[in-house]
From Swiss-Prot:
Family classification: Belongs to the AB hydrolase superfamily. Hydrolase RutD family.
Protein name: Putative carbamate hydrolase RutD
Classification lineage: Bacteria, Pseudomonadati, Pseudomonadota, Gammaproteobacteria, Enterobacterales
Pfam families given in the database record: Abhydrolase_1
InterPro entries associated with the record: AB_hydrolase_1 (IPR000073), AB_hydrolase_fold (IPR029058), AB_hydrolase_sf (IPR050266), Pyrimidine_utilisation_RutD (IPR019913)
Catalyzed reactions: carbamate + 2 H(+) = NH4(+) + CO2
Source organism (scientific name): Escherichia coli O127:H6 (strain E2348/69 / EPEC)
EC assignment: 3.5.1.-
Gene: rutD
Length: 266
């Protein structure tokens, strides 16, 4: 699996791995790259079955497989210890990595994540699946911003959204791969295992997230032994895109604090 690695800003700089959500594209993290590159070696990638890592995914594709293939790719690149920043599905992959490779994951940042899918989130995905089946990729892509962004943010950026729609259609991961990745997301359940995650965790959520209620992050916070929760008042599900200034400040401060906390505990 292909990875994109930034040059380390200094010798032995900590590594931060960015894992996007269901869309799978590493470019989702573009608003974070410039600030992270100054302090960390940053790893981005298109998830298997998407972008520049095309593949046909098995029907039983799982979050555990997503975690294993990423860890194997990191080890092949010479990276054995790393912090993880995951958004939604990416946060699930991050938790799986922390469970399966505890010696490798130094810190986990969960952005609008959850222990197991909430009934409201499931309903949103059911509606989106119906759109996919009835209207194809175009209907799926055109509906996506409604679940990602605040209304006023979208209203002020109509040309940008049109350009994003065209790009998403051109690089659509395919119906079968999308549904198999979505099914993996829906099957994931960390409610009985989260207390085994020992690395420090920063939880970031947005109070106006239409797709994932903030209660999901509260449940995560209660279940994880060593976690802190930060709530953004604005930004929607893709809060790192819509309000990068606020998000980046939370992320940089959180990573610095938790990595120091981790080193002090060793």
């Amino acid at each position: 699996m292909k990875l994109s690695l930034s040059p380390p800003p200094y010798a032995d700089a900590p590594v931060v791995v960015l894992i996007s959500g269901l869309g799978g594209s590493g470019s989702y993290w573009l608003p974070q790259l410039a600030v992270l590159d100054q302090e960390y070696q940053v790893v981005c990638y298109d998830q298997r079955g998407t972008g520049n890592n095309p593949d046909t995914l098995a029907e039983d594709y799982s979050i555990a497989q997503m975690a294993a293939e990423l860890h194997q790719a990191l080890v092949a690149a010479g990276i054995e210890r790393y912090a993880v920043v995951g958004h939604a599905l990416g946060a699930l992959v991050g938790m799986q990595l922390a469970l399966d490779y505890p010696a490798s994951v130094t810190v986990l940042v969960s952005v609008n994540g959850w222990l197991r899918i909430n009934a409201h989130t499931r309903r949103c995905f059911q509606v989106r699946e119906q759109l996919l089946h009835s209207g194809g990729a175009q209907a799926w892509v055109e509906a996506l911003p409604l679940f990602l962004y605040p209304a006023d943010w979208m209203a002020a950026r109509a040309p940008r959204l049109e350009a994003e729609d065209a790009l998403a259609l051109a690089h659509f991961q395919g119906k079968n791969n999308l549904l198999r990745r979505l099914n993996a997301l829906k099957r994931a359940d960390f409610s009985h295992h989260a207390d085994r995650i020992r690395c420090p965790v920063q939880i970031i959520c947005a109070s106006d997230d239409l797709l994932v209620p903030t209660a999901c992050s509260s449940e995560l916070h209660a279940a994880l032994p060593d976690s802190q929760k930060m709530v953004m008042r604005y930004g929607g599900h893709a809060c790192n895109v819509t309000d990068p200034e606020t998000f980046n400040a939370l992320l940089l401060n959180g990573l610095a604090s938790l990595l120091h906390h981790r080193e002090a505990a060793l």
